[in-house]
Amino acid sequence: METQQVDAVTFEDVAVDFTQEEWTSLDPVQRNLYRDVMLENYQNLATVGGQMFKPSLISWLEKKVELTVIEQGILQEWEMHLKTKRTALQQDRFWSDMSNGMQLGREHSGGEPGDPVQVGAVFSEDSCPQTHSSTSNTGNTFACNLDGKDFQPLLKETSTEENIVQLNQCVKPLIFTPDVSQKKCTPEKSVECSDCGETFVNQLELQTHSSSHREKNIHKSEECGQASTHPISHGGHVIPTEKKYYECKKCEKFFTHPVYLNIHMQSHTVEKPYDCKECGKAFTERSSLIVHLRQHTREKSYECKECGKTFIQPSRLTEHMRSHTGEKPYQCDQCGNAFASSSYLTTHLRTHTGEKPFECNICGKAFTRSSYLLGHIRTHTGEKPYECKVCGKAFSGRSWLTIHLRKHTGERPYPCTECEKAFTSFAQLTEHIKTHTGEKPFRCKVCARTFRNSSCLKTHFRIHTGIKPYKCNYCGKAFTARSGLTKHVLIHNGEKPYECKECGKAFSTSSGLVEHIRIHTGEKPFECYQCGKALAHSSSLVGHLRTHTGEKPFECNQCDKTFTRSSYLRIHMRTHTGEKPYECKECGKTFPERSCLTKHIRTHTGERPYECKECGKGFISFAQLTVHIKTHSSERPFQCKVCTKSFRNSSSLETHFRIHTGVKPYKCSYCGKAFTARSGLTIHLRNHTGEKSYACQECGKAFSTSSGLIAHIRSHKGEKPFECDHCGKAFASSSYLNVHLKIHTGEKPFQCTVCGKTFTCSSYLPVHMRTHTGEKPFQCIICGKSFLWSSYLRVHMRIHTGEKPYVCQYCGKAFTEHSGLNKHLRKHTGEKPYEYKECGENFTTSADANEHETPHWGENL
């Protein structure tokens, strides 16, 4: 009865085989490394369902049989074992028999199956097995030397537990009978090696011997895919006789044996009837599926008695136990570093050799371990299979999830022995220790700056190369480091998981929270050794030190302006690009800096966190508070050299000085008007856009400037703090008072160059000039009608929108403009403010007074 053949594809693909000559050249350390690598490969394959049976070679290695056994022919037996392509049962029996010694018999005279034949070969432990007087040909069959018939080896079991190789064609049994006492026969050697002249019993021995005559060049046959180091012409076709390489035409993979290739080919067509219902992965055996399912169910049958941790495989438990015992049996001969697992040693050795066998087929990046490659590939696919059940955040690697979970639990298992500070990961601890030692072994070859680790150096080097591999999917902005992208993405999704327990303020990064807490504690741990100034952040100290050295390493490639910090350069670049990535969710206004957005939001919320200790007045920014404090001290240290006017800060002096130079760098893109200060342009642009961000909570009226809103609020309160010294008239705004004062002085400094008309206020002159030019810059986007004033456009727009914000308190009638409401109210109040001087009659509107004038003209005529 034939046994069902089992597909044993993957272990042969990864198994490393040596010739007798090669093996004897290896030292004991290399042989131990061979054992560890073979066991690791098999373990990895078994875990993912790639290996369906355990080869006897692995069983021997797991039992730690002395590797001298392999010297005595095990590797050659393994090679021949692969060539016969036996099933799992046959392989185990074959290896068991071969380890005890075997007698090979052959019978062509009709002997009974199971009877040892007289003509045969007996093998001891140091010999190689022979086959049925056969020579290997290019196919999967073997030819009998006596009758020339082809056969395929097929193993059967007998009641005497003897192994019979049945020849399918010539039906002659080969009987393997354990017989350690017999000695190896020495049949006539009729096959000669063409390279060295040595003779052998058959072609198989010659082939095994020929592998020692390796040469550099490999000659590949295009017809069959084979390749050889020493080709021999046979019928116009290259027949390899030494070390051979067989190529798979589907995936172009090379193999050293035809059996390897045949087994590998089944991986392209092999039937896998056992499907995983979770992920769809298929397996050839049920046992492999069961092992795989543990990855989904997280079934962990092997428990550690020390800590209760469970594992899927017993080998993993064994490795874990060493973390309790401290045992590290695998030591590196190069540097003496010891490891708890052979796989760790194997990976570590690659740091000495530089070997990175696992290469990404997308970007070409190579890794020392397959697990690293798997995690890297997820950066291309975006796959994040490990999800946090607390906050829903997903990760590409299990280790990242483990470290992340410690943020929720507060667990910090890695304490520093120097300062007792603890960390969530060993990598963080390693980096922290260098802050005590000051060790920075990695130096930049361009600017000589040093770093604590190679990854920081690699990230830094991108500043010089300009490479920014991490791109934001929302806005396309690119970053040199992944951490920069991670922080940036939080701007788009608004996520702020780190909250201050003191004031409730939330931050997108843990470092942001740590820096914020120092505001409450007043801690400033970073001190300048030059002047003794203390700062709350290390980055602030770095920037501060450059004020002493004068270093400004960050240069704008547009205007050559230099900056002490990269963040300043990044913000400056937005003046060239016009980029404003920070948008207010209340009014849609955008800003080039996050700090500007933060200040702007306070205009909506009314928050004024910076309070003056002198008068209690609050401000939305620290800069405003600093300027205000100088009003109490009357300090104005910055003086203009032209007119000796003094200012509280250098920026105000710089803006003022443009009055003397005539420089107006801020130009309106709508009408071309230029301004000496950016704030002037910002306010002016609102005339074109109609934007009024500052709304009165009492009546809903909106204003383009905060000062306009403040003045308006005083109209509700009746507050008019600015009083005229000449007539006692009071005003809600200082600007209104300044315009009024010119009535008393008769000053009209703003003159029209066309007609000579003068005006008390500068804003009146450009409006007047439009009467000469005919310019009407404020256009309705709906009907195209243009206006001289933005206020006219605003009132006009209400015709299209139907908005009537001014409502009569008596009858409820609504109007589009305030003047319309005032006229209407006079009907209810009876007020008639317009008097005709000729007859003394009063009217409710100026239009009525003008109409009344017409009859008097007739009387005068």
Curated annotation (Swiss-Prot):
Gene3D superfamilies according to UniProt: 6.10.140.140, Classic Zinc Finger
Keyword Cell wall biogenesis/degradation: no
Zinc finger (C2H2-type) in chain: 191-213, 246-268, 274-296, 302-324, 330-352, 358-380, 386-408, 414-436, 442-464, 470-492, 498-520, 526-548, 554-576, 582-604, 610-632, 638-660, 666-688, 694-716, 722-744, 750-772, 778-800, 806-828, 834-856
Compartmental location: Nucleus
InterPro entries: KRAB, KRAB_dom_sf, Znf_C2H2_sf, Znf_C2H2_type
Signal peptide: none
Keyword field: DNA-binding, Metal-binding, Nucleus, Repeat, Zinc, Zinc-finger
Gene Ontology BP term (one): regulation of DNA-templated transcription
GO molecular function: DNA binding; zinc ion binding
Any one GO CC term of the record: nucleus
Domain of life: Eukaryota
CDD domains: KRAB_A-box
Pfam families, A to Z: KRAB, zf-C2H2
KRAB domain: residues covered: 9-80
Keyword Translocase among UniProt keywords: no
Function per UniProt: May be involved in transcriptional regulation.
Membership in a protein family: Belongs to the krueppel C2H2-type zinc-finger protein family.
PANTHER family: TRANSCRIPTIONAL REPRESSOR PROTEIN YY (PTHR14003), ZINC FINGER PROTEIN 143 (PTHR14003:SF23)
Name used for this protein in its record: Zinc finger protein 26
Gene behind the chain: Zfp26
